[in-house]
Amino acid sequence: MTVDYKNTLNLPETSFPMRGDLAKREPDMLKNWYEKNLYQKIRKASKGKKSFILHDGPPYANGNIHIGHAVNKILKDIIIKSKTALGFDSPYIPGWDCHGLPIELKVEGLVGKPNEKISAAEFRQKCREYASEQVEGQKKDFIRLGVLGDWDNPYLTMNFDTEANIIRTLGKVIENGHLYKGSKPVHWCLDCGSSLAEAEVEYEDKVSPSIYVRFPVESADEIEAKFSAQGRGQGKLSAIIWTTTPWTMPSNRAIAVNADLEYNLVQLGDERVILAAELVESVAKAVGVEQVKILGSVKGADLELSRFHHPFYDFTVPVILGDHVTTDGGTGLVHTAPDHGLDDFIVGKQYDLPMAGLVSNDGKFISMTEFFAGKGVFEANPLVIEKLQEVGNLLKVEKIKHSYPHCWRHKTPIIFRATPQWFIGMETQGLRQQALGEIKQVRWIPDWGQARIEKMVENRPDWCISRQRTWGVPMTLFVHKETEELHPRTLDLLEEVAKRVERAGIQAWWDLDEKELLGADAETYRKVPDTLDVWFDSGSTYSSVVANRLEFNGQNIDMYLEGSDQHRGWFMSSLMLSTATDSKAPYKQVLTHGFTVDGQGRKMSKSIGNIVTPQEVMDKFGGDILRLWVASTDYTGEMTVSDEILKRAADSYRRIRNTARFLLANLNGFDPKRDLVKPEEMISLDRWAVACALDAQHEIKDAYDNYQFHTVVQRLMRFCSVEMGSFYLDIIKDRQYTTKASSLARRSCQTALWHIAEALVRWMAPILSFTADEIWQHLPQTESARAEFVFTEEFYQGLFGLGENEKLDDAYWQQLIKVRSEVNRVLEISRNNKEIGGGLEAEVTLYANDEYRALLEQLGNELRFVLITSKVDVKSLSEKPADLADSELEGITVSVTRSNAEKCPRCWHYSDKIGVNPEHPMLCPRCVENVVGNGEVRHFA
């Protein structure tokens, strides 16, 4: 009669599913988190702890989220959750940037331009409604990523209180003396009809005309005398400039040279020209002239204030000196149009050059522009060239492909154009130097971020903060109708307006009658019609949001975290404003991540068809796989994503999930309140496993603390796959399944598994949030009621290391791992040779040197459980048969033979003592002891 001993085994059992089925299961978990107020429970559990504030850089409220958004929000969420686990109070208030041109353009497409089909007030309301819809759409996707935060109370730059606080920030800028009004060239988008911030400019290749232009000399005698070239050479005499923007020629008001450069008077074919000495050869080659003769040389300084005729207008222009003139290209003489270039403007101010003012807001020449009235600037390029040819002042024309500024929204070329604007001065009150000093106080991650933003601050122009738009926070200023000076009560008036905006939003400004606030002064002062640059909106959130939200409790911001493009964007605008208002950087740490690219390193592009959307990833793989990919990728460089890479992340996920499932299945029936074994009473191997977890936890906590999330994933994988999966968990199966259910041998093992599970679930939670929550719900209850969610908990405190007097210390088990690896290698050879089936069918002899023998013999009969074979003999290396192949592990050689004993149907070990007990004729003595006796005793493994 065959007896079924299956019911005498402690087989693993758990309701924790093998398959994650994440795409299907995660939405229900999110619903549970929301219904049970998870975020508020985290806040309550963290109350009173040291704060860590990560301030959310607001994404723009327009369009669906893309993979870059997902990377950004997931990284932030990992930090917030890990800081909570590290013992911090770390609130997360998500935000959105809600004003600005992209929303205006969308709404224009829906309802028309303001003051045409719809009033400006109605238009603003439509913009507000559109932005609200976009926020809700993006919010759903961010929540779906598993990102925890105060989603019911996000900050929006269009919230009335935030709009009011942005105005108050402007007040502080004015109070500290950083604001001025000036006419200055700014980036101007013809399609936007507005100035652009530095961060809104992209550089793309553009084909432009490249022209060499003659400026005929006013007095040839004077120039000949300067060059000591009287009577030398022949033909007309000109200064030669080179430009790729012919349309700026009508605005030319000077020729700039470098005071320290050498300039030659050159016989170029049948004419005489002035060129920088270093560029004579290259210009001659460019214009196709072989006959060149130097007639004289002077320093640039000697040419100052010499006059030349404008190429096609009836006036002369001076030669001026400028340090911006180099010999990197061109002729060494620079066409200077103060309206259309920052260097031109700066040097022009030194010489009181007039501003031409020929180009209007729509990019067309005004009616008084001779030859080109009403023409668009780019339309005028061929017309200018034609005019230059007509008057004989075009030396050479060709096409050139070069990098040219474009509008980031319209992807169209922009121009520099002088307009009356409001600026934050970089030199006023020493703002530039102060900001550079503050940069050095900040921790930049990666550290190259510091040099990058330093260079940008060193070179950036004054910040033009005014815009000529409808949907934006107004510059709530009153200026004198004649002098343009600010009202003497500006700061008080700003606060009065801010209070009204707090109640009714920005429309309160547009509805305001000047007389309400100014009284009689309304006759001489007018409202400024401009709005603030949206970078002022987001750049002021350190004050408008963080300083005013109760959750932040007046604490300083610890971290800003955004893509690397934000060095010139949000990081820059925030730094400028915070330094201007509070004389300090707004952040202590700045972390930047790279952009996402496809498997071939290409940018995401509709035309290539390589766009990976977070929505598709979550529908196919689930949010946790997306989160694992983000965490396992080194974010300091480009972040590569593809279907193949995500599949690899899914494979890693399965290994982690399988480890967790093994732990839970083998904790079946374990009650920590009743069954927990004291560390000193545990089996040696179990103590080592817990100590192993403690080592891993130290490294994981350190990696989280230093934002090295790919290191966290690597350590997590090593722990699950190597230390646990291929060693400890493999070894303990026999003890778990075959010993008595309540024996010390089994409860010791379960105690270790319980400690490990409690630690593992917390390590995972910041990254694999959904899966960690699922594991948490399946863990055995503790003596004090288990918290409802893992996210309110700190890292596990119950792990312990090996004692100082531990005989079988970590070094011991590391040696055992090497031996086991070598035994497995030889067993695999025997399996492949069909000499054995599984390892339990083998009898192993280890020929070991004295060191290894002493090591192995400490385990006695339990060595076979570590090696997972039915029998192990340890002999001296000197007894090794001559024909036995050497091992790959020095000091030990392994011999494997097939066991001739019988297989025990209960434990599957082979034994020559099966049937010794007549009542259980099929069982080995060990199983008999475990079934009807007191149970086998284990000490080591």
From Swiss-Prot:
Description of its domains: IleRS has two distinct active sites: one for aminoacylation and one for editing. The misactivated valine is translocated from the active site to the editing site, which sterically excludes the correctly activated isoleucine. The single editing site contains two valyl binding pockets, one specific for each substrate (Val-AMP or Val-tRNA(Ile)).
Q: Where does this protein hold ATP?
A: 606
Among NCBIfam families, the record links this protein to:
ileS (TIGR00392)
Protein name per Swiss-Prot or TrEMBL: Isoleucine--tRNA ligase
Needed cofactors, names only, are: Zn(2+)
The UniProt entry's GO biological process terms, in alphabetical order, are: isoleucyl-tRNA aminoacylation
Q: Kindly give the PROSITE patterns that the UniProt entry links to this protein.
A: AA_TRNA_LIGASE_I
Q: Which reaction does it catalyse?
A: tRNA(Ile) + L-isoleucine + ATP = L-isoleucyl-tRNA(Ile) + AMP + diphosphate
What is the E.C. number?
A: 6.1.1.5
Q: Where is this motif: 'KMSKS' region?
A: 603-607
Give the organism's phylogenetic lineage: Bacteria, Pseudomonadati, Pseudomonadota, Gammaproteobacteria, Pasteurellales
**Which CDD domains does this UniProt record tie to the protein?**
Anticodon_Ia_Ile_BEm, IleRS_core
User: How is this protein annotated for GO cellular component?
Assistant: cytosol
Q: Where is this motif: 'HIGH' region?
A: 59-69
What positions does the entry give for L-isoleucyl-5'-AMP binding?
562
Kindly state which keywords UniProt assigns to this record, in alphabetical order.
Answer: Aminoacyl-tRNA synthetase, ATP-binding, Cytoplasm, Ligase, Metal-binding, Nucleotide-binding, Protein biosynthesis, Zinc
Question: Per its UniProt entry, what is the enzyme's top EC class, as one word?
Answer: ligase
Report the source organism. Haemophilus influenzae (strain PittEE)
Cite the PANTHER family for this sequence.
ISOLEUCINE--TRNA LIGASE, MITOCHONDRIAL (PTHR42765:SF1), SOLEUCYL-TRNA SYNTHETASE (PTHR42765)
Q: What subunit structure does UniProt give?
A: Monomer.
